[in-house]
Amino acid sequence: MDPKDLLKPSSGSPAVRGSPHYNDKPGNVIEFFGNYRGGVSVSVSASCPTSTASQSNTRQQQHFQKQLTATGDSTNGLNNNVPQPDLSKAVSLSMGLYMGESDTKVMSSDIAFPSQEQIGISTGETDFSLLEESIANLQAKSLAPDKLIEISEDPGGFKCDISAQPRPSMGQGGSNGSSSTNLFPKDQCTFDLLRDLGISPDSPLDGKSNPWLDPLFDEQEAFNLLSPLGTGDPFFMKSEVLSEGSKTLSLEDGTQRLGDHAKDMLLPSADRPISQVKTEKEDYIELCTPGVVNEEKFGPVYCVGNFSGSGLFGNKSSAISVHGVSTSGGQMYHYDLNTATISQQDVKPVFNLGSPGTSIAEGWNRCHGSGNDTAASPGNVNFPNRSVFSNGYSSPGIRSDASPSPSTSSTSTGPPPKLCLVCSDEASGCHYGVLTCGSCKVFFKRAVEGQHNYLCAGRNDCIIDKIRRKNCPACRYRKCLQAGMNLEARKTKKKIKGIQQSTTATARESPETSMTRTLVPASVAQLTPTLISLLEVIEPEVLYSGYDSSIPDTTRRLMSSLNMLGGRQVVSAVRWAKAIPGFRNLHLDDQMTLLQYSWMFLMVFALGWRSYKQTNGSILYFAPDLVITEDRMHLPFMQERCQEMLKIAGEMSSLQISYDEYLCMKVLLLMCTIPKEGLKSHALFEEIRMTYIKELGKAIVKREGNSSQNWQRFYQLTKLLDSMHEVAENLLAFCFLSFLDKSMSIEFPDMLSEIISNQIPKYSSGNLKKLLFHQK
């Protein structure tokens, strides 16, 4: 069959849309890259001889025919009879976004980048003289729909359409049958975007609007453009680097004009979504592409961009900065990157199809402006190590904190306020050794000096805050003690102030006098840590029992709670003993022996001190949440034991024992009982014990100051230490009984059970020696 017969439509069959059309008139209508068409009609007039193009571009024609055969675009006999000129590649790729009729929107919404298999163009093979000639021919001769010639389907089942009617859109990010990604949404064409950017929407087929002669890319104005962004357009890029999965494209005319100023840029792959230029929301603008510098035509909203080369655009250091983006609400946002930026005063719209790189920035500075929209001086809030632009960045959450109150902005600049450790109110200073407010300071002083017996109406776990701190004085007082408030801390503070004042007075002396004296003032010797000061530091804190006061009291439950509290206090006493200066120099067996013999002495003496300081010796203050009142004393087995312990608290109250005296006496009670055979390091033990006896004498002198009364007080205090033996022995006897008598069902903690089990044989055999100050 004659090949011309194949090109004629069958009789009686209407023209099939989507098929290439040929007639006997001069010229051929050619369709190339069927999967990459945007509704563009291309006509090759007879004045352009195909034989010449075929001779000069034989290698290009063969390469192009292979591509058509691979993609199923060749028709039966079409490749042999209709040779393809070289200008097809240039028109298909380069003018796909610009060509069309002058009275019709040329860009359809389904323009798509073909994949690598669909484009077979090598660098250096583009002829721009043919391209300009084809543009001139297209302007002179445009195809009308009624002049198109129809043919039926070819034997290969391939259909083509050369009509100028737009194709159905797939939407942005969609794909057609050839898996190519569309550039624009279906409700937007190229000229709509160019009109938004301020570019004239006239048809690029106009001779005055030739894209290759556009003054925007003149050599003179290349300096006014942002040089990295000038080459960001894929139509003006060099051919050294393109994105992975695509071949290079070289447009020599464009690169000659920008060769001195343009740098290489990575072209995004076809399957990556194209970033939107800008997104206008309620009263602010989101910049989605770093290559867009836009000046709005309405209102006080504006943006100015300063850019310099980044890793994508050359070897320069990355620096992107967008300053002064203000909104009608008065907010201002500031994005700042490295300092090596090039300011640009000529704000021209630059359309960049390349999406931003994966890492362009290293920091993010955000500032807020208040007042008027035009004259707001932003302050910087730095967020280091945070990327500004990324692939598909849409600026989420910018408006979440856009309107800070004046109080918030003022307080954020200064240090955070200090809070009271008791009620979490704003602290007024350090009172009684703890950072508290004035209200808790006064409350604690009155509670201690007034000797109030506070009881919690709940479960000793009331919430103490700024609003509810007056609801429960017992829990508030317990929290004060837990925080570490102590009336003795006030005296220590006064001592420190006296030392500082004496040091300041010495420093203010005349230079002549200070030169003759030693460089170390006399007050420095008082700053040397003493044994008393060290004992103050290592003193254990007050522990809580966790006793539930809401449940009716029983002897079994109350004693079990006291034993559990005693076990924890023994653990605390072991840590305290190891921190005593000189105690760890003893043999390890001696340390364990002294603790096993003296644990009850330490517990009772500390209980008497707490009862004396908190209740003036009227009731037993085991813990802030466990106080033995008169009602609890009348329980079985409680009356006699509590009366013995109250005697110790009463003696302390009558003698008005100071804190320094209490600390020294407590260490002496640790060393008041030893085995009959003595200790392994007995000499060292005697030396340490005598050292703390002398410290007790120093504490007495420090308190009294009169030598005639010092010995009397020393006698009274040592008599109190001797009386502790009788009280401790009676309590130990009852403790051993309750431990051995399982019918009482009194619980003991593990550590306390171990100590009692080891101590019972020693006491029963009488293998102990009391170290008394006075003979009976």
Swiss-Prot record:
Protein name: Glucocorticoid receptor
Family: Belongs to the nuclear hormone receptor family. NR3 subfamily.
Keywords of the record: Chromatin regulator, Cytoplasm, Cytoskeleton, DNA-binding, Lipid-binding, Metal-binding, Mitochondrion, Nucleus, Receptor, Steroid-binding, Transcription, Transcription regulation, Zinc, Zinc-finger
Gene name of the encoded protein: nr3c1
Ranges annotated as biased composition (Polar residues): 47-83
DNA-binding region: 420-485
Organism: Xenopus laevis (African clawed frog)
Low complexity: compositionally biased ranges: 403-413
Protein's UniProt keywords contain Transmembrane: no
Stretches annotated zinc finger (NR C4-type): 420-440, 456-480
Ranges where the NR LBD domain occurs: 523-757
Record region (Hinge): 486-522
Quaternary organization: Heteromultimeric cytoplasmic complex with HSP90. Upon ligand binding the complex undergoes a conformation change and moves to the nucleus, where it dissociates. Binds to DNA as a homodimer, and as heterodimer with NR3C2. Interaction with numerous other transcription factors modulates transcription activation.
SMART domains for the chain: HOLI, ZnF_C4
InterPro entries: Glcrtcd_rcpt, NHR-like_dom_sf, Nucl_hrmn_rcpt_lig-bd, Nuclear_hormone_rcpt_NR3, Nuclear_hrmn_rcpt, Znf_hrmn_rcpt, Znf_NHR/GATA
Tissue expression notes: Expressed in liver with relative abundance.
One Gene Ontology biological process: positive regulation of transcription by RNA polymerase II
